[in-house]
Amino acid sequence: MNSEFRSPIGKITQINGKCISLVGNDIDTDRIIPARFLKCVSFDSVGKSVFEDDRKNLKGRHPFDLEKNKNASILIVNSNFGCGSSREHAPQALMRWGIKAIIGESFAEIFYSNCIAIGIPCFTLPTKSIQDIQKYNANKSLFLEIDLKKSLAKAEDLNFQLDIKESSKKMFLSGEWDATSTLLENENLIEKKNNDLPYLEFSTDL
């Protein structure tokens, strides 16, 4: 787990980090964050419970417990990742563990949307490319540089042309995915608009 977690804000154009591989198809949201952790009042503590049951069963051998994966921030997965229930706790748990981007063969649609909403880009690659990365990463740590504008990931002598929905890409590059920051940056325009709307004015005169 990354002890220096900071929530992403604004424009996202570049992501650099160490990869962590999670091998297996159809890894669902209940495995990512078990249902008993959904009762939390806030998302602050869900990062430490990510893959709780899988990690307990593997007794320290789960990728998220290996020393070599400490402070990893780019998750490499296989197909249909994030399937199952639509719980937004799943991407929140991954983000608060330290994940900043996910590269996989395919993603469940709702999980993908939930990731985009909190600033986690999800990229796809062909099966062979994913397997090549996972195989390489099994032997030594792989550090990737992701250029979101070019949809390109590179590391040493490796280059991968990533695929991402154009609408999602535009939101990250412009910062539009982050509604709060967008509102704060345009506070003056919002105030002016409010002042121009007659139905927002009220009077106590009867």
State each model region's role.
Residues 1-206:
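Fe-S-dependent hydro-lyases/dehydratases of central metabolism
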